[in-house]
Every structure is written in structure tokens, then in C-alpha cells.
């Protein structure tokens, strides 16, 4: 029997500021980071009932991500992406998440550098 495909919720183009980088000059002040998140969950119940209780509260996820990013400091974009993924996997409905973090201006002659990770809940 084929596994049921999961539905997707996209949170696109969150622009925030945080201390991010390994070099002293990067750590003096907050820098822009652009974040894109894809939450994967079975949304079929919410499609039938039209009730917020039956879906992922993506506003709550966004608020927690923003609070964490703005209050934290990171050396690596990879670590920032991992912390965001951990938050996104907290709601019981979310099975998988994809997180893309862009650091504009990180490389000379490049508009941005991006890291994308995928994580899923561990089987219990």
C-alpha cells in the first residue's frame, strides 16, 4: 500500500535580523536573513471540518521562529536552519519540514548564500 502524500504549508520570505557569522565584523550588529519554510502535514481533517484545531497553527509557528531568531546569535547558517526546523516540528500535525535560510551579501559578487535542510519527526 502506498504511503499517503502529505500536504504542504508554505511560509515564504520571512525577513529578520540576527547576529550571524564567524568573523568579528559579522558579529558587531544584526544582519538580514531571509527564511522560507515548508511544513508537511496531513491536512485532510482540516479540509473537511474547516476548524483551526484540525490543522497546523502556522501563525504560532511563525511567532516562535521570529522570537528565537531575533533573540539568538549563531556562527553558522546551518545551525540557524536546524533551530528553525526544531521549532517547526513541535506541532503534532507536522511530519516533515524544509527550511531555507539565505544570508544576503555573504559572498562578494553573489546576491545571497542559502542553506536548505529537510528534517522529519523521529519514529517513536
Language-model features, listed with the residues they occupy:
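N-terminal, polar/charged subdomain of small-to-medium soluble alpha/beta proteins
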Residues: 1-124
